[in-house]
Amino acid sequence: MTIKIAIDCMGGDHGVSVTVPAAISFLSRHDDAEMVLVGLPDAIRAQLKKLHALDHPRVSIVEATEVITMDDPVEVALRKKRDSSMRVAVTQVKEGLAGACISAGNTGALMAVSRYVLKTLEGIERPAIATTIPNEQGWGTTVLDLGANADCEPEHLLQFARMAEAMVAVVDHKEHPTVGLLNIGEEVIKGNEVVKRAGELLRASELNFYGNVEGNDIFKGTTDIVVCDGFVGNVALKSTEGLAKMIGSMIKEEFTRSWFTKLLAAVAMPVLSRLARRLDPARYNGASLLGLRGLVIKSHGSADAHSFEWAIKRGYDAAKNGVIARITRAFADKSSAAGGVQSAPETEAPGAHPSPHVA
């Protein structure tokens, strides 16, 4: 089965200079992938020419005449820039012309555009942003929400857990992954009323609920999934990124203080290289916008080509493993058990409709 990925080529801090090389590099490693490059055709073709990939058989260009900047407010993205590369890329997923969309663009705009174009799945009130954070176990902890919903109801946290459970089960091949609820302590009496009520709902659910976890448990790998509201999750993520940069800077500073420390660095290089590979932030680039009727992956805005390629892989893996179908089924099963609504229609297969944007 061929997996088509729509790339918002104009998004992020670096635009086509990062997105196009990343897409071509990904194709060289995955024979069953195709790239739909969305944006200004001349800019995209110029990059393809540099890469000697102008006539690549698994690359198509879809024209978009506008670009959403990192500073554009949500209103501009939704109401004024209707032919932006971001929106056209997301529309490729809606029309079944791509299995996933990857963008390094404005997070708020991407969430708003994706929710407007794709809509949420039946049974899901709010989409959530999920990503993987490295842990001691080596596989990474899936954490959500990371900023889409600053204020949540207990039921939202339960929905987040179900969405993450479905994704981890098929992408990481872990049936019944463990779920932790981020709190200020492990005891059930800890936390505000929303968190305590969410804990009750999770304990009564079909999920493999471990209980409350604290911030350090994310890095210990105590559970496969950690659930929290978007305010707490975003603070935790940004704190993690800041700490990682500080530690890296301090290590570099200490090893370059003198000729002796430089010698020690040379001796320790094999160990440092292995550590760097384990903690390489590029490997964890790409946050999934869960709860929508299509796959959308948000890359870090400042990502380089290597890092953006990992975001593409996240979308590719999710599409190949049927994440949307799994989430849809999970919520349909709960609705059926409760005599509720039926499942949402699954995303159509690529190639279902012609596109007016093909350049």
Curated annotation (Swiss-Prot):
Subcellular location: Cytoplasm
SUPFAM superfamilies xref list: Isocitrate/Isopropylmalate dehydrogenase-like
Region (Disordered): 338-359
Annotated Gene3D superfamilies: Isopropylmalate Dehydrogenase (3.40.718.10)
EC number(s) reported in the record: 2.3.1.274
Keyword Nucleotide-binding found: no
Reaction(s) the record says it catalyses: a fatty acyl-[ACP] + phosphate = an acyl phosphate + holo-[ACP]
Cysteines joined through disulfide linkages: none
MF terms (GO), sorted A to Z: phosphate:acyl-[acyl carrier protein] acyltransferase activity
Enzyme class, broadest EC rank: transferase
Quaternary state and interactors: Homodimer. Probably interacts with PlsY.
Entry similarity comment: Belongs to the PlsX family.
Descriptive protein name: Phosphate acyltransferase
